[in-house]
Amino acid sequence: MGAGSSTEQRSPEQPPEGSSTPAEPEPSGGGPSAEAAPDTTADPAIAASDPATKLLQKNGQLSTINGVAEQDELSLQEGDLNGQKGALNGQGALNSQEEEEVIVTEVGQRDSEDVSKRDSDKEMATKSAVVHDITDDGQEETPEIIEQIPSSESNLEELTQPTESQANDIGFKKVFKFVGFKFTVKKDKTEKPDTVQLLTVKKDEGEGAAGAGDHKDPSLGAGEAASKESEPKQSTEKPEETLKREQSHAEISPPAESGQAVEECKEEGEEKQEKEPSKSAESPTSPVTSETGSTFKKFFTQGWAGWRKKTSFRKPKEDEVEASEKKKEQEPEKVDTEEDGKAEVASEKLTASEQAHPQEPAESAHEPRLSAEYEKVELPSEEQVSGSQGPSEEKPAPLATEVFDEKIEVHQEEVVAEVHVSTVEERTEEQKTEVEETAGSVPAEELVEMDAEPQEAEPAKELVKLKETCVSGEDPTQGADLSPDEKVLSKPPEGVVSEVEMLSSQERMKVQGSPLKKLFTSTGLKKLSGKKQKGKRGGGDEESGEHTQVPADSPDSQEEQKGESSASSPEEPEEITCLEKGLAEVQQDGEAEEGATSDGEKKREGVTPWASFKKMVTPKKRVRRPSESDKEDELDKVKSATLSSTESTASEMQEEMKGSVEEPKPEEPKRKVDTSVSWEALICVGSSKKRARRGSSSDEEGGPKAMGGDHQKADEAGKDKETGTDGILAGSQEHDPGQGSSSPEQAGSPTEGEGVSTWESFKRLVTPRKKSKSKLEEKSEDSIAGSGVEHSTPDTEPGKEESWVSIKKFIPGRRKKRPDGKQEQAPVEDAGPTGANEDDSDVPAVVPLSEYDAVEREKMEAQQAQKSAEQPEQKAATEVSKELSESQVHMMAAAVADGTRAATIIEERSPSWISASVTEPLEQVEAEAALLTEEVLEREVIAEEEPPTVTEPLPENREARGDTVVSEAELTPEAVTAAETAGPLGAEEGTEASAAEETTEMVSAVSQLTDSPDTTEEATPVQEVEGGVPDIEEQERRTQEVLQAVAEKVKEESQLPGTGGPEDVLQPVQRAEAERPEEQAEASGLKKETDVVLKVDAQEAKTEPFTQGKVVGQTTPESFEKAPQVTESIESSELVTTCQAETLAGVKSQEMVMEQAIPPDSVETPTDSETDGSTPVADFDAPGTTQKDEIVEIHEENEVASGTQSGGTEAEAVPAQKERPPAPSSFVFQEETKEQSKMEDTLEHTDKEVSVETVSILSKTEGTQEADQYADEKTKDVPFFEGLEGSIDTGITVSREKVTEVALKGEGTEEAECKKDDALELQSHAKSPPSPVEREMVVQVEREKTEAEPTHVNEEKLEHETAVTVSEEVSKQLLQTVNVPIIDGAKEVSSLEGSPPPCLGQEEAVCTKIQVQSSEASFTLTAAAEEEKVLGETANILETGETLEPAGAHLVLEEKSSEKNEDFAAHPGEDAVPTGPDCQAKSTPVIVSATTKKGLSSDLEGEKTTSLKWKSDEVDEQVACQEVKVSVAIEDLEPENGILELETKSSKLVQNIIQTAVDQFVRTEETATEMLTSELQTQAHVIKADSQDAGQETEKEGEEPQASAQDETPITSAKEESESTAVGQAHSDISKDMSEASEKTMTVEVEGSTVNDQQLEEVVLPSEEEGGGAGTKSVPEDDGHALLAERIEKSLVEPKEDEKGDDVDDPENQNSALADTDASGGLTKESPDTNGPKQKEKEDAQEVELQEGKVHSESDKAITPQAQEELQKQERESAKSELTES
């Protein structure tokens, strides 16, 4: 193409010496019409304006100098450059014509030259100022035209020059696709021949400086033309573009003759070399042009460089300039050598041009890349115009300067031109090569050629870089060329020269550093991000890549570099010094750019969770990252040696992957993770490294890891960062992997322990469970040996290890493997964990997992024989659930990190764990735990085992049972749930056993926790329920006793761990609570399904399991809270009620401890919801009220015991238990859940599987909650109390309640959609959530649905439960219950969030299943999961600032929802009173509102922190979730593009993992939290303020909630669409998260429409009143809330208690403000933790808001809600349809 156009243009270029005439013939040659017009126009332009003639003199002097002196070269290279620049949108032709047209100043400007001539006066006048302005403006204008025109031209040229163009075409078209620059792509295509000929110019320049001069003339002429024409470009560029079109079209035909043109270019090049002396004669004008060119150079070098630098490509571009300078300096030497053999080299160069055409087009592509880069970077249009014309023209302009300098000596000029051209070419090649190196570890030269194809983004970048090269490279070209030229001519402006020298030295530094950078950048970037990232990061990557490629790209540039080293030896020392620095910088920059490139690529590709993960890694574009890659590799290798051979091999493999494809490596594993491909390979590969890193970090951080499992990961990541940037990668990847599925194992295991032990523990947990027990034992022993120190170091670390293990268990691949191995082991381990629990006395407290499994299996088999065939199944599920739960518990226990954590981790982590310090106590604990477990199991079965035994080991049982008993607690509640369900469903139990087994397998694959819950439900319930109804009473007594004992012990221990332990306890408690509430919620649904009889039985059984689950599951934390609560409940002297109250209080206290404000209510409510909501509603209805008081007492006591928790628990527990009728809602939702469960699982035993899966999901959620709370706790070791008590659960409650709305509505919809799919369920959640209006309408509708869909169900169950009134009370209680269960579920879901890595897939599935199966029964979980997601979304939205609006909108909305629900629920005053599901959904969101604003702020704080920590842990899973969260986070985390990328990356995992929904939520939370924990407190404060104010205002506007919220909702819809397209599951999750973000937003929006307009007005009124008050308070309090969240969370107990007490003390707030108290009060309870009094004010303001908001909402409800309701319903329905479609 370049050859053809060059040849054809050469013949006219010979006339271009005569300016217009040559230009006209040149068009005939290069493009007769196109160039004739340019030249004709150019002549009039020249004639019209003397300044244009001056410009022509500049450009034309470039042409004269370059053209006269280099006219032969110009002819040759004009053909080449015309071809090349014809490829450059005819810039080559115009630039060549510029050069050819000595008089026609910017013939090289192709068409712009005429315009430049026309506007030469303007250009000359405004050359300095206007060049930039017009370059900006003109480029902005012209690039569009040029983009379009050169696009066709370039396409034609590409078609004409398919070989050159196609190679370039592929990459450049992609660049355009990615970069969106038509011009760049086609220009790149067009320029590719130019660049190739530019390379040819290098060679020819050796022969005839004219060739290089021509190339420089095109480049410099184009640069000058760009400079000059940039000034007239606004007016001129369009004509220029037309001219360029003509010339490009004219050149398009020449490109067809590229082959011939190359030869002709050789011949004509020689002729032009001869003619160049004529042009050299014409070059007298070059001095002026040289100065002008210098000015232009300054402008372009500085101005363009400034633009480039603006684009954050300054260094790369400067480096490019330097690289080009280097190349130029090197090439001047070459050119000097080449000049001697100019004629010969001209022919050779023509041949080289032909050969180099592919490279040259690539280089030409780099010029367009530069312009495209400009367009991308700063002045997309302007810079593209300047970049396309400007860079080409700029290059001619600077080249003109150089050419002017070169005028003095045509040969030297040619040398300069050659050097510059070569520099440009080399730089272009280097850019290409570097970009390609960045793109991949492809050889630089291969990359140069390949860059034409793959580096499509590079064309723009390299155009930008070529602009740099021309702009800043003009100086470099002069500087580099003038370095030799100064030596030779020393005529270039000294300022430019010095500038050039500086740039040259810098560039050399970076160029010389470029080989390393090549290595780093080429590692995996080419493959992954070569195209998109380059387009995105082209400026940075390619520039540094160019520098890297300068040596590698062209032997000439290397030779020149060597020669130039001599020529510029003064610069070389600097260069060397700088090069060393620059080398590191280039490497680091390359790495950073690599990361940026990969990030950009990720963003562009939107591909990967890997992109998100990589961005998390890459955001650490840190200089040390390259070195840390090495360090990490070294560490990985060193530590891999410690690993097992498989692990070592995998570690080495991953190290190699990481080393060679450092970034692609995580991406590939991530994709594997996404694909669930070879988790073990991924685990071994990625986890070994990170395990090794983390192993050392874990060894170092053994103790800290307990509390800071996630912190530890972050710390380890920090350590790794300290260790090396790869450590950063590893750290972020550890964060990511732990969270992401890709390296959760990678990140998880490393953090877990020595790495080997951790890894092997993880491996044991994941895959090896299938493996021989001896293997597991060996691994356990090895792990114990390796991690004995670590594990003796702590319980924290084992817990973390276990949490990682759990995380990894829940990872999709792991899930699959683990379900296989674990399910396989589940039967083997049927006796295992249970046996371990019962036989813990016999089994050492710290038993290797393999030994533990073997021994436990044997013992459990014996016990199974003793117990029953079903109990073994239960225990198989129990074992699986146990291990999963324990793994999660370990996660939670790792979070707990105290005695609970030690025991919890000890039991599950025994293999890894067996540390002498822990072993003996744990043996005792396990003995006790075994007794307790046996007792608990027997209590479950017999309900008559010694509760004292449970009580006796309770301290240890906290620890041991934290794991064992938590698992059993999970099992027990699940078993009790199953028993409760199975009692009535006695026949179902067998079916449930099989269905639960199937479900267990299904859930095993989906979530392993579900396995044990299913089995547990299957087996235990029969005995328990059948024979355990009296036993349940005994169990209640014993539960009370145990709870008392546990409460006492837990009080002691929680007081001891009070700060760490209680937190840790909170997490186990929250785990157990989450488990129990979820189990109870699901069991509630099941029990509701089962019957009121089961309610009584389930209540007792559930209370017992719940209590046990709590006591056992909560072990220390649960026992702590339970103990206070149980003790206080017992102190309340209501044993049965106390049991329930204890259970509720325990749950409440526990969840209060966990969530501490709303969690107590949540805990209590889950007891109500799950205990009451299901069967216990009958028992708990009376205790509900009593327990309300009890719970008030208990919570008051728990205020003392739990501290802040008590207040919220009291207020919330009282309302929750007041509104005891959650059962109807639970019934409705349960049957919906059943239906959903049936629909989703298509399970025959919907009730069974609702029980099984719901309970399983609950167990999942339990374990996940444990892990999540563990993560939350970790995340907020300090904030955990703060955020745990207030923040987490506040946010969680908010999320839950929002999710409850979502779940209620979404579950109504979900009922239909859960029938469709979990994804659709999530989508229904997402769909339902998208509009809280629709939520409310859907809640109403779905109340109607739920009462209509479940009308058969809901009415049946509402009829069961006293339809509406009961539903209202149930709604109240479900408000409370849903608040609590949702809070609990949110906790659980928060746990799911926190634990999502372990339970992510499971938990996601759990959330899905909970939402589907337990959609109604586990509605709390679904709501909780979705609330949690909403919380994450709310966190993100809060971060985005929309959460607060949904919070206030939600709060008010929910009260309005309650009022709306009042329509259904007939309780306008009570948000909880509305129809149980609706009331739950809406009342819960009311709680969510206050909580959302306050607690969510706190929770965002806490969950931010939690998310931050879990983000580290869940980076991979977060990556899995990130795509979901990308959509959501795109809405919410648009400020958090990194998170978006993470979310994008996580989309794969999201696709693979519904757990991403929770993860997504968590990570949206966490990602948002992570970014926004720092940001959020600022950003969330601001955004909360803005979001609340704006969101409230938006909500006021009602449609503006749709604006902001609907922006999110359309984004949610779009994102949900994209995510629907991307992932059905991910879409479900995205729909969930996005819909929940949308839901929150739509809650803002929909609530803005129905309730949001009601409550937007209301929330905007109150929220703006509160925006002034709660909004202001919310904003300040969100600020203060986030800040106070941590502060007050730190001081959490007292402020919380005060606030809680106040809120609890507010009866009004507790009733209508019950939702308010639950919302505001619970939030105040939570929020008090966070905000303390502020929260109260907020709550009061919110309550006022809620009340006002109800009024306003009612008004707005009537006014805006319907419009917006419809709008947002439409939005939601569109989102739903999108989600449904997806």
From Swiss-Prot:
<dbReference type="GO" id="GO:0010739">
    <property type="term" value="P:positive regulation of protein kinase A signaling"/>
</dbReference>
<feature type="modified residue" description="Phosphoserine">
    <location>
        <position position="698"/>
    </location>
</feature>
<keyword id="KW-0449">Lipoprotein</keyword>
<feature type="modified residue" description="Phosphoserine">
    <location>
        <position position="347"/>
    </location>
</feature>
<comment type="subunit">
    <text>Binds to dimeric RII-alpha regulatory subunit of PKC.</text>
</comment>
<feature type="modified residue" description="Phosphoserine">
    <location>
        <position position="154"/>
    </location>
</feature>
<feature type="modified residue" description="Phosphoserine">
    <location>
        <position position="629"/>
    </location>
</feature>
<feature type="compositionally biased region" description="Low complexity">
    <location>
        <begin position="986"/>
        <end position="997"/>
    </location>
</feature>
<dbReference type="GO" id="GO:0032760">
    <property type="term" value="P:positive regulation of tumor necrosis factor production"/>
</dbReference>
<feature type="modified residue" description="Phosphoserine">
    <location>
        <position position="19"/>
    </location>
</feature>
<feature type="compositionally biased region" description="Basic and acidic residues">
    <location>
        <begin position="1333"/>
        <end position="1355"/>
    </location>
</feature>
<feature type="compositionally biased region" description="Low complexity">
    <location>
        <begin position="640"/>
        <end position="652"/>
    </location>
</feature>
<feature type="modified residue" description="Phosphoserine">
    <location>
        <position position="1328"/>
    </location>
</feature>
<feature type="modified residue" description="Phosphoserine">
    <location>
        <position position="787"/>
    </location>
</feature>
<feature type="compositionally biased region" description="Basic and acidic residues">
    <location>
        <begin position="108"/>
        <end position="125"/>
    </location>
</feature>
<feature type="short sequence motif" description="AKAP CaM-binding 3">
    <location>
        <begin position="801"/>
        <end position="821"/>
    </location>
</feature>
<dbReference type="GO" id="GO:0007186">
    <property type="term" value="P:G protein-coupled receptor signaling pathway"/>
</dbReference>
<dbReference type="GO" id="GO:0008179">
    <property type="term" value="F:adenylate cyclase binding"/>
</dbReference>
<feature type="modified residue" description="Phosphoserine">
    <location>
        <position position="697"/>
    </location>
</feature>
<feature type="compositionally biased region" description="Basic and acidic residues">
    <location>
        <begin position="1766"/>
        <end position="1782"/>
    </location>
</feature>
<feature type="region of interest" description="Disordered">
    <location>
        <begin position="1"/>
        <end position="53"/>
    </location>
</feature>
<feature type="short sequence motif" description="AKAP CaM-binding 1">
    <location>
        <begin position="607"/>
        <end position="627"/>
    </location>
</feature>
<dbReference type="GO" id="GO:0090036">
    <property type="term" value="P:regulation of protein kinase C signaling"/>
</dbReference>
<dbReference type="GO" id="GO:1900143">
    <property type="term" value="P:positive regulation of oligodendrocyte apoptotic process"/>
</dbReference>
<dbReference type="GO" id="GO:0005516">
    <property type="term" value="F:calmodulin binding"/>
</dbReference>
<feature type="modified residue" description="Phosphoserine">
    <location>
        <position position="554"/>
    </location>
</feature>
<dbReference type="GO" id="GO:0005938">
    <property type="term" value="C:cell cortex"/>
</dbReference>
<feature type="modified residue" description="Phosphoserine">
    <location>
        <position position="1587"/>
    </location>
</feature>
<dbReference type="GO" id="GO:0051602">
    <property type="term" value="P:response to electrical stimulus"/>
</dbReference>
<feature type="modified residue" description="Phosphoserine">
    <location>
        <position position="749"/>
    </location>
</feature>
<feature type="compositionally biased region" description="Basic and acidic residues">
    <location>
        <begin position="1734"/>
        <end position="1757"/>
    </location>
</feature>
<dbReference type="GO" id="GO:0051018">
    <property type="term" value="F:protein kinase A binding"/>
</dbReference>
<feature type="region of interest" description="Disordered">
    <location>
        <begin position="71"/>
        <end position="169"/>
    </location>
</feature>
<feature type="compositionally biased region" description="Polar residues">
    <location>
        <begin position="157"/>
        <end position="168"/>
    </location>
</feature>
<feature type="modified residue" description="Phosphoserine">
    <location>
        <position position="806"/>
    </location>
</feature>
<feature type="modified residue" description="Phosphoserine">
    <location>
        <position position="381"/>
    </location>
</feature>
<dbReference type="GO" id="GO:0005737">
    <property type="term" value="C:cytoplasm"/>
</dbReference>
<dbReference type="InterPro" id="IPR018459">
    <property type="entry name" value="RII-bd_1"/>
</dbReference>
<dbReference type="GO" id="GO:0007165">
    <property type="term" value="P:signal transduction"/>
</dbReference>
<keyword id="KW-0677">Repeat</keyword>
<feature type="modified residue" description="Phosphoserine">
    <location>
        <position position="696"/>
    </location>
</feature>
<feature type="modified residue" description="Phosphoserine">
    <location>
        <position position="280"/>
    </location>
</feature>
